[in-house]
Every structure is written in C-alpha cells, then in structure tokens.
A protein has these predicted regions:
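Bacterial N-terminal signal peptides that target proteins for export
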Residues: 2-10
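N-terminal signal peptide c-region/cleavage motif recognized by signal peptidases
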Residues: 19-20
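N-terminal alpha-helical modules
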Residues: 25, 40, 60, 79-81, ...
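Tryptophan-anchored aromatic micro-motifs
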Residues: 27-51
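A glycine-biased structural micro-motif
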Residues: 32-33, 59-62
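Short hydrophobic/aromatic-rich beta-strand segments that constitute the beta-sheet cores
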Residues: 37, 71-75, 170-174
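Contiguous, well-ordered beta-strand patches that form the walls/edges
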Residues: 41-44, 66-156, 241-244, 252-256
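Residue-level recognition of beta-strand termini and adjacent short loop/turns
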Residues: 158-160, 166-169, 177
Length: 282
C-alpha cells in the first residue's frame, strides 16, 4: 500500500513537470514590472546592412512591461502584445542562446566563435543563466524571429524573442533585425528626465512630457537622434538649414497636441522615423 502511494506521488510529480514544460509556467515574479532599454547591441563582426544603429534612439529608452495578463512594449514598429503569457525555461548559456537563435552563426560553432564577444555584451563565461521564451494566446512571442536555416529544428534553434536574466535588475533580450537589447528594471520611484529642464517647462505639451516617464524617454530619444543627424551633417559638409527648420516645425506640430498624451506620442514616433530615414540616406 505504501509503495503504491509513493508510486502515485512520483507519477503526479512527473505529470506536473511534463505539463509545466508543455503549457509553461506563470511569469516569474522577478520579471513583473517595467523594464527600459538602456543599450542596443549589434554584431560587430557582421558586414551586413542593418536596420538599426548601435544604441539606436528608436529602441534605446523604449519600455517593456511584463504583467501576468500581458506583455507590451512601445518599441519602434513592433508593438505586438502578448496576452496571458507563460514562461518556458531554456537550459543554455548566453553564448549558446545566441548561437541557436541569431543569424550568421553555425551551430554547433567552433570554440573560438563567441557571439557574446561579437555583440560586446558582458560575458557570463559559459555559465548558465536564467533564460526563457514566452508563449501567448496567439502563439510564441515574436514568433517570426529565429534562424532561417532551422528546418525541422536541425540546429536546435530557439525561435521567437527570448529573455536572459543577468540578475534581478538586468536582462538581455533577443530582438528584431538580429539586435540584442540590454534592459534595466525601472524603479517605482524613478525620476522623470526630459531633454530639457522640466522646471522651465512653459507649454502644456512640455508639462505633459515632464509628467510622463514614457514621453520623457521619447523626448530624450528624439534629442539624441537629432544630435546624431546634426553631427552627420557637419561631418559630411551638408547644409543644416533644412534639418534645423524641420526640427522647429516638428516642435510646433508637437505642441499643437496640447496635453494630449496619445497625440504627443504619435508625433514623437513620426519624428523618430523621419530622423532615422534621414540618417540612413533615404
């Protein structure tokens, strides 16, 4: 009788493990909250033309929010939400994760091939870190990502966006266009910092920006993107009259939104796209 009870307990435990592996587990509590992109890393050994630049302002500063009900973000172009997310653990080192999901690498790879080094990320020296993918009600989060040569999983590929937690405040996120993002958790008391002194805010739009962590982050991104455009124009000897005029016209257009947050956000997104298109020569 005692042996039968033990057998049933073992069987039940095995069932729970299998079910968790198939269905996933709730989001880890450590993940819940808002995270902000602090760094945008590219493969420094790749010669291909990329959509994004190193620390691209369209991605740097963006916010990812993780809750038990939904994962959302305000990253450029791909705001895809993940409803009712479940986490699926991945048992691998950061190097292995990158080899199995990013393009441009063979898998298995020679020992001297190190995408962690190529992307200039802090190396975990082969240690296993906590990593997982997310499943949503509509399928895998960012499920179109992954190696194009992973037919029938021959390369043990990891599709979709994956998360690797370096610690409880820092994560690596595999993102679009073979980009790696470094995010930090946003403290609940994080100060709001715009590109201008909020004490000198004079319009309703500026006051709205200074009252929103998200809008202030976009404001900083636009200021950085504009600075890059000016530097590029100076370096190439291009006239800056049009660039300066366009920025002034945009500020006027932005301020026409008043305190309407969605209007301001839309105006900021468009300006970021315009500045990026200009820097790419299109």
């Amino acid at each position: 009788m005692k042996k039968r009870k033990i057998f049933h307990l073992v069987a039940a435990f095995a069932f729970i493990l299998v079910t968790t592996d198939i269905l996933g587990a709730p989001l880890p509590a450590i993940l819940t909250g808002k995270w902000q992109v602090k760094e945008v890393h590219l493969n420094t050994e790749s010669g291909r033309t990329t959509e994004y630049a190193w620390n691209d302002p369209r991605l740097r500063g963006r916010i990812f929010e993780f809750t038990p009900d939904e994962v959302s973000d305000d990253a450029d172009d791909f705001p895809g939400r993940c409803a009712e997310p479940t986490a699926h653990d991945i048992d691998a080192s950061l190097r292995d994760l990158m080899l199995r999901s990013l393009g441009g690498y063979a898998y298995p790879a020679p020992a001297d091939v190190d995408p962690v080094r190529d992307y200039k990320l802090e190396s975990a020296e082969g240690m296993h870190i906590r990593a997982f993918t997310l499943m949503c009600t509509t399928g895998r989060w960012q499920g179109d990502l992954g190696r194009s040569d992973n037919t029938d999983n021959k390369n043990k590929g990891i599709p979709g966006a994956w998360i690797a937690l370096a610690d409880d405040q820092k994560m690596y996120l595999r993102w679009r266009d073979e980009v790696m993002l470094v995010l930090m958790k946003i403290p609940s008391n994080a100060p709001i910092q715009a590109s201008f002194p909020c004490l000198k805010a004079s319009t309703s739009t500026e006051h709205a920006i200074c009252g929103s962590y998200q809008l202030a982050a976009f404001d900083q991104s636009i200021a950085e993107s504009y600075r890059r455009a000016v530097d590029q124009a100076k370096a190439s000897g291009s006239p800056m009259v049009t660039l300066i005029q366009d920025q002034r016209l945009w500020i006027k257009d932005r301020d026409a939104c008043g305190a309407n947050v969605q209007c301001i956000l839309g105006s900021m997104r468009r300006r970021l796209a315009e500045l990026a298109a200009g820097s790419n020569g299109s």
